[in-house]
Amino acid sequence: MHQEGKDEDAAKALLDYYRARTNVKTPDINLNKVTISKEEQQWADDGLKHTFFVHKGYQPSYNYGEDINWQYWPVKDNELRWQLHRHKWFTPMGKAYRISGDEKYAKEWAHQYIDWIKKNPLVKMDKKEYELVSDGKIKGEVENVRFAWRPLEVSNRLQDQTSQFQLFLPSPSFTPDFLTEFLVNYYKHAVHILANYSDQGNHLLFEAQRMIYAGAFFPEFKDAPAWRKSGIDILNREIHVQVYEDGGQFELDPHYHLAAINIFCKALGIADTNGFRKEFPQDYLDTIENMIMFYANISFPDYTNPCFSDAKLTTKKEMVKNYKSWSKLFPKNQAIKYFATE
């Protein structure tokens, strides 16, 4: 249809295709059993009024105006600016829509999604500027790109938008025109990461794992196999570069270590769901198991972690959930099974 110049018909047919598609899934969301916490419901409802949950360290959340100002920076903390572009309230809006059936959530999500695209153009910039090496010297659209298009934030959106796509897909607000804008934007995100991967560390792991999501969830893109392969190749390489023989992640930070475990596991989750687990060798799993035991051995009896380096405190509830998840991967490991019980 597209080749015949019938773009509107092609977009409608593509939307019908995605609404009927059943062969691609993500482990993050079960559409038959959507649940929402009280906190997520609050984020969704606040989001309708453009009061966006960005960071737990800055509460109550800030309002970004009726005409959203994506460059609003109420406190000059880089994290507040970066994390705005992770759109943490979008998936809760999707859950609220699915549970309530109220179209206001879908309509507002589609509006904010397009508004973000319009107001955050990707302009050319030296890759090193994503780490703010020329702080204070860059202004305007280029300055905004450092925050809106930093590869870590882009990868956040790549992953989370697979859930949002599924949650909002049945909505009348998810029009053929919107689908076209969504797919063009999503493609731009993946291409951007491919050319701007972080050099090392947990950021590189996050980006690689989320490129696997992009390639697995949208296999219809011609470049999807290359996206998936790039992520898998990086994780298979970096699990040996970043993890010492004793199981410790080389940034020597308990929180980054925990994040790395879950990144490696998340990649296995999307692989299992979509049938490409064999692309991860046995020593990949062995290393994850070693990392889990390392983490258990540096944790306190109440499941919390020591807070050195850039670490933040975990909770027992969060860690029991982690151990339960890990125990499914390593059912023969009695120590992990022990920590998974209370």
Feature-to-residue mapping (PLM):
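Alpha-helix capping and helix-loop boundary segments enriched in small/acidic/polar residues
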Residues: 148-152, 177-181, 198-202, 222-227, ...
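Carbohydrate-active enzyme catalytic cores, enriched for enzymes
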Residues: 244, 248-342
